[in-house]
């Protein structure tokens, strides 16, 4: 028998050649794409600056957008805080003791507010560091979307985007400030807060009061929806202090400023900062100074620090040191906050409080 062979018609030869050319084209184009990606060229995700390169270094974020999301997060968290309080089912429990021996309480309001605030911010800005007072369950992957709308009051004050490297940003969330007062149904002291720090410096802050629905915000070198009062009493100031150690501050304050000084015990660091400002909330007390003499967490004070700084005020340790919002989550040196006063002169007046603050 004659050996069998394979015969191809002219059409078959043409098809075979076309298939071969197609294989060679894809191999060659893939090779070129790989070579281009080494130099950051090419526009497809995963092949250039818009893909892995951007994800690796976090890119940039717009502080104006972060302010808009921070306001929304504080309000959304506040909705949860108010809903739980009005249900009167708090599921209150203790996380342990504070350094002063008081119960460090947590409620459903804290947890649910934290969940809303954290995931709204994390979904909008996945590449930034977010520090929050309450635990975040790693298994909880809720996605809460932002509609990318910036409110008119923010656009009016912050007229242009403000881009910063994402890796320089740290967000501090307090999902429910004044939990002790919350459990006692002292609603006026309760706030939700968000702060954005850039390279450790507080740049924007939001303080929201869930029960009056008042929100204060400010951005350093940007704008604000709140302002300082027209005058402050520096000689015999009204001093707002923590309810838990008002007597400790009162003793030294009277020695420093005289017996005409008024001490205002209050709950919540957010409430105390608002006491220094022109706030159109009838439940808000007014003070000239805010003094704290014990250890305090940074999520309690960062938003207030940013707002005061944006308005020309100051918040420092009792020894006058600026507070860095990186690293550890608390400060040891007490706290002094003022606005439209000679802050360093006040620091020099309070040596005894500084010593007390380090005990």
Swiss-Prot record:
List of residues binding Mg(2+) 2: 174, 177, 300
Principal cellular location given in the protein's record: Golgi
Positions in the Cytoplasmic compartment: 1-12
CC per GO annotation: cytosol; endomembrane system; Golgi apparatus; Golgi lumen; membrane; nuclear body; nucleoplasm; trans-Golgi network membrane
UniProt-annotated binding residues for Mg(2+) 3: 133
Activity control mechanisms: Strongly inhibited by lithium.
Lumenal side: 34-359
Biological processes per GO annotation: chondrocyte development; embryonic digit morphogenesis; endochondral ossification; phosphatidylinositol phosphate biosynthetic process; post-embryonic development; skeletal system development
Annotated disease: Chondrodysplasia with joint dislocations, GPAPP type: A condition consisting of congenital joint dislocations, chondrodysplasia with short stature, micrognathia and cleft palate, and a distinctive face.
Protein name per its UniProtKB record: Golgi-resident adenosine 3',5'-bisphosphate 3'-phosphatase
Organism: Homo sapiens (Human)
Name of the gene this protein is made from: BPNT2
């Amino acid at each position: 028998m004659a050996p069998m062979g394979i015969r191809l018609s002219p059409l078959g030869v043409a098809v075979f050649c076309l298939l071969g050319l197609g294989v060679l084209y894809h191999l060659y184009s893939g090779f070129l794409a790989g070579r281009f990606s080494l130099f950051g060229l090419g526009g497809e995700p995963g092949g250039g600056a818009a893909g892995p390169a951007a994800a690796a270094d976090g890119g940039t974020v717009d502080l104006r957008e972060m302010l808009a999301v921070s306001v929304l997060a504080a309000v959304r968290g506040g909705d949860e805080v108010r809903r739980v309080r009005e249900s009167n089912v708090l599921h209150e429990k203790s996380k342990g003791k504070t350094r002063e021996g008081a119960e460090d309480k947590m409620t459903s309001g804290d947890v649910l507010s934290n969940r809303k605030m954290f995931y709204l911010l994390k979904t909008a800005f996945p590449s930034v560091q977010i520090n929050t007072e309450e635990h975040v369950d790693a298994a909880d992957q809720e996605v809460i979307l932002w509609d990318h709308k910036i409110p008119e009051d923010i656009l009016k004050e912050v007229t242009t985007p403000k881009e910063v490297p994402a890796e320089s940003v740290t967000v501090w969330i307090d999902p429910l400030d004044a939990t002790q007062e919350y459990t006692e149904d002292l609603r006026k002291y309760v706030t939700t807060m968000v702060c954005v720090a850039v390279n450790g410096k507080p740049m924007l802050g939001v303080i929201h009061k869930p029960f009056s629905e008042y929100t204060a915000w400010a951005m350093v070198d940007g704008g604000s929806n709140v302002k300082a009062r027209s005058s402050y009493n520096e000689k015999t100031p009204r001093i707002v202090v923590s309810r838990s150690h008002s007597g400790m501050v009162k003793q030294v304050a009277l020695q420093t400023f005289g017996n005409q000084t008024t001490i205002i015990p209050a709950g919540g660091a957010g409430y105390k900062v608002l006491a220094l400002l022109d706030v159109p909330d009838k439940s808000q007390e007014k003070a000239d100074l805010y003094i704290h003499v014990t250890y305090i967490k940074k999520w309690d004070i960062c938003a207030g620090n940013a707002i005061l700084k944006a308005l020309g005020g100051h918040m420092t340790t009792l020894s006058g040191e600026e507070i860095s919002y990186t690293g550890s989550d608390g400060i040891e040196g007490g706290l002094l906050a003022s606005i439209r006063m000679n802050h360093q002169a006040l620091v020099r007046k309070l040596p005894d409080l500084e010593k007390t603050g380090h005990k």
